[in-house]
Amino acid sequence: MQLTGREIVERGIITNIDEENGIQQQGIDLRVIGIRKLSGGGCMPLFGKTKLPNYSPVEMEVEPERSYWRLEPGYYEITFEEGCKIPSNLAMTLIQRSSLLRCGGIIRSSQFDAGFSTDHMGSFMEILHPVEIEYQARIAQTIVVETAEVRQEDLYHGQWAEQQNVVQRGRF
């Protein structure tokens, strides 16, 4: 069963929520605070840890009224203001908000497994047409579903646990 936005808040699954604008019917909106563009290749070995590709920070345009990223078509790593703490009986994915999709952007999310936790969630975004995205714009939404209980020893303990991305902070 998919949780409602209110249930997600009550269970403390998402942190740093914009409680005024971010709670939706079936999820929580996520605000972007950092964007880096893919600029090299990676390696997925048979054994061992993934070698990540290179990502280059995208500079923010700063105007008196707003701060934003001007994005050209490409593949981007994104960092959100919100964090998460996934309990042992839930899993989560992210999807783009319809406004981003209408502008030619698609969020590419893997599953956030039971036991995963971070102060700032991250995901990936494919941009198909040039677009401007403002700092802290709500571009993604959580989808949290109940699962069978995962045993303590089987909870997520992978290489991305508690990873902190370096993010750009907007200036106003």
Pin down the residues of each PLM region.
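DUTPase catalytic domain/fold
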Residues: M1-F172
